[in-house]
Swiss-Prot record:
This is Riboflavin transporter RibZ. InterPro entries: EmrB-like, MFS, MFS_dom, MFS_trans_sf. It is a multi-pass membrane protein. It comes from Clostridioides difficile (strain 630) (Peptoclostridium difficile). Transports riboflavin into the cell. NCBIfam families: efflux_EmrB. Induction: Expression is probably regulated by riboflavin, via an FMN riboswitch. Signal peptide: none annotated. PANTHER family: BLR6921 PROTEIN, MAJOR FACILITATOR SUPERFAMILY MULTIDRUG TRANSPORTER MFSC. It holds the Pfam family MFS_1. One of its GO terms (cellular component) is plasma membrane. Belongs to the major facilitator superfamily.
């Protein structure tokens, strides 16, 4: 087997472990809360602390990987993630579990920050899309299999086992990484590190994510503080020659446009992920298990489409594939915006199939297009930047749609029945999501540069 495919397998192990860990934990949270005798507002910090650390540090580890070697850092990430998993499994109270999750999150952040750049450097230009598409499919498999595997583990072995399963996989991955990951391409031009820029960026992202978990004045104060820190960061990065934010990369049109349309894809996804389970269980009266089956429709389609979309983008360029992707997502969200309480379930499933086509056709062509404009010695930074954008978009999308839906529902209940108010609030949310996707479509059509794959 050629080394590039071994490299891809090693990266996919890390992708699978990190996505599986997150999706399993969502299922295990109620069990852990009952075991520790705590409420759900307390157990949410097991998830929130992990998300804060990952999002705030990914860009740092991406840049660090370019300087010291992404392969070394990736292997270290596996080691830290594995040790963190062991510590989580041994936790006997909430504070210990949160501390262990923070340690584990450092490893996960390294894996997410450096993995995509390693894959991009390992494959030639005409195979990058296919390779990145395979990693996208693994993300979908991890997210889909998490609830199933988690349910089996919780029923037969208890919640510590959801962390124990990471340990043997992690040990194998560490040895594979040491033996097979290629010699790194280092960024020799800039060995210095913008520590103040790093601290400002980490503080800004942390405050944004904390604000998403608060309400009222606390959210407002955190948001204002985050804005002030962002302005300070912007002023510093413009004036400082060797800045933490790699501003020269934004001169590349596809790098800039690709990250902007990333927001237009990932932000609206949360309307579906957050609101749809409530629609299925409360308005369609489906059991949680049946609702779960319905919610696997679009991830399943995504798993099937992602590698195909990656291969097509290698042959025909990313722009046409991304145009189709946003068209599918916009159409599907408009369809969801037209659903009523008594709409047949098959109409929703059709919308989810179309939505899955759009999602599956997005990530690998867009990631490939972004990284094609990034020099080999900066691939770690490029991959970590788009991963940071993705995480922030998910967090902001969840906060926005949950808040908007709740406010719309409360307002409309003054004039309508609960069911009618629910449908109105849901439809309005999907119209907003569709509008954001349509903006992504416009940006793709008019601003993304069409690459000549034959030259690549």
């Amino acid at each position: 087997m050629k080394q590039k495919w071994i490299v891809l397998i090693i990266i996919c192990i890390g992708v699978f472990m990190s996505t599986l860990d997150g999706s399993i934990l969502n299922i295990a949270n109620p069990t852990i809360a009952a075991d520790f005798k705590i409420n759900m507002s307390q157990i949410q910090w097991v998830v929130t602390a992990y998300m804060l650390v990952v999002t705030a540090t990914m860009l740092f580890f991406g840049k660090l990987g370019d300087k010291v070697g992404s392969n070394r850092l990736y292997t270290l990430g596996f080691f830290i993630f594995t040790i963190g998993s062991f510590l989580c499994s041994m936790s006997n109270n909430l504070s210990t579990l949160i501390s262990s999750r923070i340690f584990q999150a450092v490893g996960a952040s390294i894996l997410m920050a450096t993995g995509l750049g390693i894959v991009s450097n390992a494959f030639p230009a005409n195979e990058k899309g296919k390779a990145i598409g395979i990693t996208g499919a693994v993300v979908g498999i991890g997210n889909m299999s998490g609830p199933v595997i988690g349910g089996i583990i919780l029923e037969h072995f208890g919640w510590p086992s959801i962390f124990i399963i990471n340990i043997p996989i992690g040990i194998i991955a560490v040895f594979l990484g040491i033996k097979f990951l290629p010699k790194p391409v280092l960024d020799e031009q800039n060995k210095s590190f913008d520590i103040p820029g790093l601290l400002l960026f980490a503080s800004c992202t942390t405050l944004i994510l904390l604000a998403m978990n608060e309400k009222g004045n606390t959210r407002l104060y955190l948001g204002i503080t985050a804005l002030i820190i962002f302005l300070l960061l912007a002023l510093r990065e413009v004036k400082f020659e060797q800045s933490f934010i790699d501003l020269p990369l934004f001169k590349n049109r596809n790098f800039t446009v690709g990250n902007i349309i990333g927001v237009a894809c990932y932000f609206p996804q949360m309307a579906v992920s957050f609101l749809l389970p409530f629609y299925l269980e409360q308005l369609k009266n489906l059991s949680p298990m049946m609702a779960g089956y319905v919610m696997t429709v679009h991830p399943l389609i995504m798993v099937l489409i992602a590698p195909i979309a990656g291969s097509l983008s290698d042959k025909h360029g990313a722009k046409n594939i991304l145009t189709a992707s946003f068209s599918f997502m916009t159409i599907s969200l408009v369809g969801m915006a037209l659903l009523k309480a008594d709409s047949p379930l098959y109409l929703l499933i059709v919308c989810l199939v179309i939505f899955g086509l759009g999602l599956g056709a997005f990530s690998s062509p867009n990631n490939s297009s972004i990284l094609a404009d990034v020099p080999p010695q900066k691939q770690g930074y490029g991959g970590s930047f788009l991963a940071t954008i993705r995480n922030l978009s998910f967090a902001l999308g969840t906060a926005f749609f949950s808040s908007f839906f709740a406010q719309s529902l409360t307002y409309n209940q003054k004039f309508k029945s609960h069911t009618s108010a629910y449908v109105i609030a849901s439809n309005q949310s999907y119209w907003i999501a569709a509008s954001v996707c349509f903006i992504g479509l416009i940006l793709t059509v008019f601003f993304m540069r069409k690459t000549d794959k034959s030259i690549s």
